[in-house]
């Protein structure tokens, strides 16, 4: 493969695997535990999807942010395998990219072990050469550190890479790292939300990536 795009970096949650209901349920339980006098609707929780847990909890309840994060992670791991879902066509598209020798990596705001658990449950783990979790970087997305680390480990340059994600943190991180960017229309916040951050591409389905990388050759 000698095309312009050789390297594809993906967010995990809401992009490769559908963890939306797991995340929302975990936030609901955590918030009820620590802030029982406040009511958080589903719509209230949607903005929490994407940022790191500490960023969210420090904004909501700074005095108990560490405790909330620990409670969240414990509940999330306990219910992880039962509540995550696969997106149609993702496995097939990632397998096709892998079989065509594209370099594939993940850059997520989740911890490495939790990323790997989700990948193994969905069978995607065998396709990714590099996985960067929050515990491997000093600065979470939209800082470009994770993307730059992944590119270095993959021996790839920003000019030949694209960052794919479902949240503005992913698009902004890609722009900050000076890669191409793609949003996913199946993002829980909707394609209109992502479009305002001007990704280079908007994927209606994951297989759209195959056409994009082939067109760049």
Curated annotation (Swiss-Prot):
It comes from Listeria monocytogenes serovar 1/2a (strain ATCC BAA-679 / EGD-e). One of its GO terms (molecular function) is inorganic diphosphate phosphatase activity. The active site is at residue 11. Belongs to the HAD-like hydrolase superfamily. PpaX family. Its cofactor is Mg(2+). One of its GO terms (biological process) is DNA repair. GO terms for cellular component: cytosol. Transmembrane segments: none annotated. Its EC number is 3.6.1.1. CDD domains: HAD_PPase. Keywords: Hydrolase, Magnesium. It holds the Pfam family HAD_2. It catalyses: diphosphate + H2O = 2 phosphate + H(+). InterPro entries: HAD-like_hydrolase_sf, HAD-like_sf, HAD-SF_hydro_IA, HAD_2, HAD_sf, PGP-like_dom2, Pyrophosphatase_Ppax. It is an enzyme of class 3 (hydrolase). Hydrolyzes pyrophosphate formed during P-Ser-HPr dephosphorylation by HPrK/P. Might play a role in controlling the intracellular pyrophosphate pool. It comes from the Bacteria. This is Pyrophosphatase PpaX.
């Amino acid at each position: 493969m000698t095309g312009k795009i050789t390297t594809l970096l993906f967010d995990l949650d809401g992009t490769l695997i559908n963890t939306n209901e797991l995340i929302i349920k975990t936030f609901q339980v955590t918030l009820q535990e620590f802030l029982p006098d406040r009511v958080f609707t589903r719509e209230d929780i949607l903005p929490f999807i994407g940022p790191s847990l500490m960023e969210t909890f420090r904004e909501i309840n700074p005095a108990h942010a560490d405790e909330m994060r620990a409670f969240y992670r414990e509940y999330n791991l306990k219910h992880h395998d039962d509540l995550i879902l696969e997106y149609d066509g993702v496995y097939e598209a990632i397998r096709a990219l892998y079989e065509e020798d594209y370099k594939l990596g993940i850059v997520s705001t989740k911890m490495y072990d939790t990323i790997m658990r989700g990948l193994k449950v969905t069978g995607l783990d065998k396709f990714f050469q590099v996985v960067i979790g929050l515990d491997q970087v000093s600065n979470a997305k939209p800082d470009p550190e994770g993307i730059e680390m992944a590119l270095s480990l993959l021996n790839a340059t920003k000019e030949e890479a694209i960052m794919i994600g479902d949240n503005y943190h992913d698009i902004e991180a890609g722009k900050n790292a000076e890669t191409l960017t793609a949003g996913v229309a199946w993002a829980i916040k909707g394609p209109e939300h992502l479009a305002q951050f001007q990704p280079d591409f908007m994927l209606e389905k994951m297989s759209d990536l195959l056409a994009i990388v082939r067109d760049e050759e």
